[in-house]
């Protein structure tokens, strides 16, 4: 009888947030050292160019693929010769549900890449090591700060667009 007095869960109740890793994998990997062994005969004064980006796409209901793209290009300061170019696309499939739009954006551009970064960092380090170059240990990335910068840029662009629209009237 006590069970009859309980109300069943309704669709309007808040859904609990879910973030689960389904799979982590290497989507693409490349290591190029076109000027070997010539660069080994020069003084090692590297100039490092590091690029990072993310991509996300929905695969199905509550299922998303997130790709973390890392590119490290190292040239020698004195000669400008390319020492190596290392590109890694570390990806993961995630189950994500119960999030508002802004929370979902944060999850796809910050939380998921944060989970992928250690795998990508290890790949880059191993590839550089296999090329017999000095160790390269990428510093941790604050994806939350990058997400906040992105939001601020969007807000600034929105304000600039509104200002130019007001001036045209």
Swiss-Prot record:
Matching PANTHER family, A to Z? PROTEIN-EXPORT PROTEIN SECB, PTHR36918
Please state the gene responsible for encoding this protein.
secB
Please name the InterPro entries in this protein's record: SecB (IPR003708), SecB-like_sf (IPR035958)
Its recorded name reads Protein-export protein SecB
One GO MF term: unfolded protein binding
| Keywords (A to Z) from UniProt | Chaperone, Cytoplasm, Protein transport, Translocation, Transport
Q: What's one Pfam family here?
A: SecB
Q: Where does the UniProt annotation locate this protein?
A: Cytoplasm
Q: Upper lineage ranks?
A: Bacteria, Pseudomonadati, Pseudomonadota, Gammaproteobacteria, Pasteurellales
Task: Give the species this sequence originates from.
Answer: Mannheimia succiniciproducens (strain KCTC 0769BP / MBEL55E)
A GO BP term here is: protein folding
Describe the subunit structure: Homotetramer, a dimer of dimers. One homotetramer interacts with 1 SecA dimer.
Family affiliation: Belongs to the SecB family.
Q: What job does this protein perform?
A: One of the proteins required for the normal export of preproteins out of the cell cytoplasm. It is a molecular chaperone that binds to a subset of precursor proteins, maintaining them in a translocation-competent state. It also specifically binds to its receptor SecA.
Example of a GO cellular component annotation carried by this entry = cytoplasm
Instruction: Report the superkingdom from the record.
Output: Bacteria
